[in-house]
Regions:
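C-terminal helical subdomain
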Residues: 168-171, 175-177, 193-233
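The beta1-alpha1 cofactor-binding region of Rossmann-like NAD(H)/NADP(H)-dependent oxidoreductases
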Residues: 37, 55-66, 97
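Catalytic loop of short-chain dehydrogenase/reductase
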Residues: 131-154, 160, 164-167
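Conserved glycine-rich cofactor-binding loop
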Residues: 11-13
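Substrate-binding pocket helix/loop in short-chain dehydrogenase/reductase
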Residues: 91-92, 99-104
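Active-site loop of short-chain dehydrogenase/reductase
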Residues: 3, 76-77, 122-135, 168-172
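Conserved glycine-rich Rossmann-like NAD(P)H-binding loop of the short-chain dehydrogenase/reductase
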Residues: 25-41
Length: 233
């Protein structure tokens, strides 16, 4: 039986690669993002086992409606990837309270809304997987990125707390630290002379996400760090 996945905050780069990987592995996938045009283009490319659901994940009502649309199309949700992130790249003296709150709402509050919407399906099925997409800033606060760093630290704490709460119920919660820059068309334009080996390949990272989903219950990963082999850490 095909598994049903929701990717919350899909976009060009890693989110798109995760969606493609899940479809290739036989999943039925709900794609959440704000851009209806982008979602329509991506879902058309990926085929009939994909549902585009334009959603603002900071709005609990929209999130609930989005999950209900996925259930009606594909059935209960087995997999959730909390992938959305946001935040202006500003430090303490530049960031406004509104910008700080927006970073938290997109990354952390949105992840809360999506996790709450998915968890009952997983509990009813005695299993499931919830993955948080993190960043270097989740373990080492970045200078000049106060809102982003705070939100990513928050998500890491959420993942650890949820793993302890839900693990005994058969739900695998994992946090992925993306320790490096992901190669995307936009990044390639910004750094045309940069060595490709210094980038993370999004398709390879997506393979690592699928590995987390396939792990046996006797050997679950809580936190996974991924980085290019030349990345200093």
């Amino acid at each position: 039986m095909a598994r049903t996945a929701v990717i919350a905050g899909v976009g060009p780069g890693l989110g798109e690669s995760i969606a493609r990987k899940f479809v290739d592995e036989g999943c039925q996938v709900g794609l959440f993002a704000r851009s209806e045009r982008y979602l329509d283009e991506l879902s058309t490319d990926l085929g009939e086992n994909v549902l585009a659901v334009p959603t603002d994940i900071t709005d609990p009502e929209q999130v609930d409606e989005g999950f209900e649309a996925v259930r009606e199309a594909f059935g209960p949700v087995d997999i959730l990837v909390n992938h959305a992130s946001g935040g202006s790249w500003k430090g303490l003296r530049e960031i406004s309270p509104e910008e700080f709150e927006d970073a938290w709402r997109v990354s952390s509050f949105g992840a809360l809304c999506c996790s709450q919407a998915a968890v009952d399906d997983m509990l009813a099925e005695n299993g499931g997987t919830i993955i948080f997409t993190g960043a270097t800033s989740a373990v080492r606060g970045r200078d000049g990125a106060l809102g982003f760093s705070a939100a990513k630290f928050s998500n890491r704490g959420m993942a650890e707390s949820m793993a302890r709460e839900l693990g005994p119920e058969g739900i695998h919660v994992a946090h992925v630290v993306i320790d490096g820059q992901i190669e995307t068309p936009r990044v390639e334009q910004q750094y045309p002379d940069r060595d490709e080996e210094t980038f993370l390949d999004p398709d390879s990272v997506a393979d690592s996400y699928w590995h987390l989903i396939e792990q046996d219950r006797s050997s679950w990963t809580l936190e996974l760090d991924v980085r290019p082999h030349v990345e200093e850490f």
